[in-house]
Amino acid sequence: MLSSALLCCLVFLGGTGASRGQDTPAENSCIHFPGGLPHMLRELRAAFGRVKTFFQSKDQLNSMLLTESLLEDLKGYLGCQALSEMIQFYLKDVMPQAENHSPAIREHVNSLGENLKTLRLRLRQCHRFLPCENKSKAVEQVKSAFSKLQEEGVYKAMSEFDIFINYIETYMTMKIKS
């Protein structure tokens, strides 16, 4: 009985000693995340490039959906929440509708969505990049304007996706520096 208790203690202590000084895979990926961000943004831009002309040619509106107020929220104390909500907005509201506009672009919009999901997953794994709870007024304005535009909203939101990528880059650059 004493020997099995001693064996359990040794196994436990050996396991904790071996893991001390070794990062978990999630922690390890967070160390390399800033270096991999430019590649992820290039992939997003390349995926968007395959549908950009389609959506921008269909966008006949002169107004902007993604305004400076959204960029200011991303730069401010609500940056984390604004980014999280905007990723969710594109994944849940915009892209499912965008996929249905032409069979020729469905695969490309799907690929763009997968790249955005990968970015969101990495951001969530590295909590310092996405540690948020509050709501962003700018995102609420984007969602409200999108809803009012009805079908035109999809063209508008997708045609401005490159602006969103630039906003992501601005937010992440700030976070990496801090």
UniProtKB/Swiss-Prot annotation:
Q: Name one GO molecular function term.
A: cytokine activity
State the compartments where it is located: Secreted
**One GO location term (cellular component):** extracellular space
Q: Which PROSITE patterns match?
A: INTERLEUKIN_10
Signal: present as a keyword of the record?
yes
Q: Which domain of life is it from?
A: Eukaryota
Which cysteines share a disulfide bond? C30-C126, C80-C132
Matching SMART domains = IL10
Which of this chain's residues carry glycans? Answer: N134
GO biological processes:
immune response; negative regulation of B cell proliferation; negative regulation of cytokine production involved in immune response; negative regulation of inflammatory response; negative regulation of interleukin-6 production; negative regulation of membrane protein ectodomain proteolysis; positive regulation of B cell apoptotic process; positive regulation of cytokine production
- UniProt keyword terms in alphabetical order: Cytokine, Disulfide bond, Glycoprotein, Secreted, Signal
- Which InterPro entries would you find in this protein's record? 4_helix_cytokine-like_core (IPR009079), IL-10 (IPR000098), IL-10/19/20/24/26 (IPR020443), IL-10_CS (IPR020423)
Q: Which residues constitute the signal peptide according to the record?
A: 1-18
Secreted listed as a keyword: yes
Q: How does it assemble?
A: Homodimer. Interacts with IL10RA and IL10RB.
Which family does the record claim for this protein? Belongs to the IL-10 family.
Q: What does this protein do?
A: Major immune regulatory cytokine that acts on many cells of the immune system where it has profound anti-inflammatory functions, limiting excessive tissue disruption caused by inflammation. Mechanistically, IL10 binds to its heterotetrameric receptor comprising IL10RA and IL10RB leading to JAK1 and STAT2-mediated phosphorylation of STAT3. In turn, STAT3 translocates to the nucleus where it drives expression of anti-inflammatory mediators.
Protein's UniProt name: Interleukin-10
Task: Say which species the protein is native to.
Answer: Oryctolagus cuniculus
